[in-house]
Amino acid sequence: MSLKQSFPLLETRGLLIVFEGCDKTGKSTQCKLLFEELKQKNIEVRMINFPNRTTQTGKLIDQYLKGKIYLSDEDIHILFSKNRWEIIDTIKTNILNGITVIIDRYSYSGIAFSVAKGLDFQWCKQTENGLLKPDIIIYLTGQTKNMASRNGYGSEIYERIEIQDKVKKCYEKMIEIPLWNKINADQDVLIIKKQIETIIQKFSLENNKLEYI
């Protein structure tokens, strides 16, 4: 069965597919691979990365992540959330027009990283209430020490093993089946790609109504 055949309601609306996981788990790589696969299947698709570093909030976030400016944990959490809210209408319009949207990091990253720093879970979650709920979440997870050995690790302030371990625990507490699909990120890139395609092929959109977090 082709990917296009597995999306029976794509003529009605697109899907919202979110990739989550700790840093250096291969999210961006798999987002790009899925994006190209869907394009080859003649499925209209867009790809978005959060934080979106091109906006005003995104530029501040970029400076913060690189250690160039200081912001309180509460302030940076709100800034990350605002960064998502800025383009949610565009995402919604795309989906309603039959375009599938792939997102590299979403609300769950914002919650996990903030809770890992000691903020209250419910407080962190409330800033996300009202954003679109994904149809599929691909959660890539693996051994933190393996992630730390990958190129570029440590270039941003959260890329520390002790922080990533806490983030991983927060992610594990948020997992809801069948929305979340957990994949071992320590595997070969192409094996992971195939597993993701299988998840999407098996997905059944029960109705075309959008749901919200």
UniProtKB/Swiss-Prot annotation:
Tree of life domain: Viruses
One Gene Ontology term from the biological process aspect of the record: dTTP biosynthetic process
InterPro entries noted in UniProt: P-loop_NTPase, Thymidylate_kin-like_dom, Thymidylate_kin_CS, Thymidylate_kinase
Signal sequence bounds: none
The keyword NAD belongs to this UniProt entry's keyword annotation: no
Positions contributing to ATP binding: G21, C22, D23, K24, T25, G26, K27, S28
Pathway: Pyrimidine metabolism; dTTP biosynthesis
UniProt xrefs under Pfam families: Thymidylate_kin
Catalytic activity: dTMP + ATP = dTDP + ADP
An example molecular function term from Gene Ontology annotations: nucleoside diphosphate kinase activity
EC numbers on record: 2.7.4.9
Gene3D superfamilies: P-loop containing nucleotide triphosphate hydrolases
Key words of the record: ATP-binding, Kinase, Nucleotide biosynthesis, Nucleotide-binding, Transferase
Transferase recorded as keyword: yes
NCBIfam families recorded: DTMP_kinase
Similarity field: Belongs to the thymidylate kinase family.
The protein's role, per its UniProt record: Catalyzes the conversion of dTMP to dTDP.
Protein name: Putative thymidylate kinase 251L
Taxonomic lineage: Viruses, Varidnaviria, Bamfordvirae, Nucleocytoviricota, Megaviricetes
